[in-house]
């Protein structure tokens, strides 16, 4: 099934823009920039939206205006309005359980403690959507997670995350064509 909607999870606002938790939005923003596409605020959809077309595969790019933990409502509103099935959605998000700079494509699964994914699963009524997980590493103890994800990465970690984003963007044409197995083989290797 071809992907028709890519959502970059984030917390909106300049205070959060450069934090680890916004790695998903970094990728979606970079993808739009590489295709000379510009986001526009759509208050009805509760998001910044734009559209790209790669090899005759159109896709909407979304940056929710809500905080990460409420990303599901935006995802549901947009997917219902455009009649996009959960299996046609790619959620791009930060992942504590991957080392900094790793990136993995996954279909379905649980939320793994990620509140953005938890809300999307609840709002869509299913976890059967695709995820592009950008590794941000783990602070080592669960009590440090909140502060860690809302902090800025070091320059070294930031560069590793950017490198992962480049690898993620490289598979988007394959993802949009619907060949998830090939995309997984390429990016998960």
Swiss-Prot record:
<feature type="site" description="Stabilizes the basic form of H active site to accept a proton">
    <location>
        <position position="94"/>
    </location>
</feature>
<keyword id="KW-0694">RNA-binding</keyword>
<feature type="site" description="Discriminates between blocked and unblocked aminoacyl-tRNA">
    <location>
        <position position="11"/>
    </location>
</feature>
<dbReference type="Pfam" id="PF01195">
    <property type="entry name" value="Pept_tRNA_hydro"/>
</dbReference>
<dbReference type="InterPro" id="IPR018171">
    <property type="entry name" value="Pept_tRNA_hydro_CS"/>
</dbReference>
<feature type="active site" description="Proton acceptor">
    <location>
        <position position="21"/>
    </location>
</feature>
<feature type="binding site">
    <location>
        <position position="115"/>
    </location>
    <ligand>
        <name>tRNA</name>
    </ligand>
</feature>
<keyword id="KW-0963">Cytoplasm</keyword>
<comment type="function">
    <text>Catalyzes the release of premature peptidyl moieties from peptidyl-tRNA molecules trapped in stalled 50S ribosomal subunits, and thus maintains levels of free tRNAs and 50S ribosomes.</text>
</comment>
<comment type="function">
    <text>Hydrolyzes ribosome-free peptidyl-tRNAs (with 1 or more amino acids incorporated), which drop off the ribosome during protein synthesis, or as a result of ribosome stalling.</text>
</comment>
<dbReference type="GO" id="GO:0072344">
    <property type="term" value="P:rescue of stalled ribosome"/>
</dbReference>
<feature type="binding site">
    <location>
        <position position="67"/>
    </location>
    <ligand>
        <name>tRNA</name>
    </ligand>
</feature>
<dbReference type="GO" id="GO:0004045">
    <property type="term" value="F:peptidyl-tRNA hydrolase activity"/>
</dbReference>
<keyword id="KW-0820">tRNA-binding</keyword>
<dbReference type="GO" id="GO:0005737">
    <property type="term" value="C:cytoplasm"/>
</dbReference>
<feature type="binding site">
    <location>
        <position position="16"/>
    </location>
    <ligand>
        <name>tRNA</name>
    </ligand>
</feature>
<feature type="binding site">
    <location>
        <position position="69"/>
    </location>
    <ligand>
        <name>tRNA</name>
    </ligand>
</feature>
<keyword id="KW-0378">Hydrolase</keyword>
<comment type="subunit">
    <text>Monomer.</text>
</comment>
<dbReference type="GO" id="GO:0000049">
    <property type="term" value="F:tRNA binding"/>
</dbReference>
<dbReference type="InterPro" id="IPR001328">
    <property type="entry name" value="Pept_tRNA_hydro"/>
</dbReference>
<dbReference type="GO" id="GO:0006515">
    <property type="term" value="P:protein quality control for misfolded or incompletely synthesized proteins"/>
</dbReference>
<protein>
    <recommendedName>
        <fullName>Peptidyl-tRNA hydrolase</fullName>
        <ecNumber>3.1.1.29</ecNumber>
    </recommendedName>
</protein>
<comment type="similarity">
    <text>Belongs to the PTH family.</text>
</comment>
<dbReference type="InterPro" id="IPR036416">
    <property type="entry name" value="Pept_tRNA_hydro_sf"/>
</dbReference>
């Amino acid at each position: 099934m071809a992907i028709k909607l890519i959502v970059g999870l984030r917390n909106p606002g300049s205070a959060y823009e450069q934090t680890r938790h916004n790695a998903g939005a970094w990728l979606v923003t970079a993808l739009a920039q590489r295709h000379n596409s510009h986001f526009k605020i759509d208050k009805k959809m509760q998001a910044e939206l734009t559209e790209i077309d790669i090899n005759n595969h159109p896709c909407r790019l979304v940056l929710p205006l809500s905080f990460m933990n409420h990303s599901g409502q935006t995802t549901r509103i947009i997917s219902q309005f455009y009649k996009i099935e959960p299996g046609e959605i790619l959620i791009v998000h930060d992942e504590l359980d991957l080392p900094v700079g790793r990136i993995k494509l996954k279909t379905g699964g649980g939320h793994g403690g990620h509140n953005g994914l938890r809300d999307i699963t609840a709002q869509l009524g299913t976890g059967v959507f695709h995820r592009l997980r950008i590794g941000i590493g783990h602070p080592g103890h669960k009590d440090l997670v909140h502060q860690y994800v809302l902090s800025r990465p070091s320059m070294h970690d930031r560069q590793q995350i950017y490198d992962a984003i480049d690898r993620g963007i490289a598979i988007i044409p394959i993802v949009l064509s619907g060949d998830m197995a090939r995309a997984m083989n390429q990016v998960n290797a």
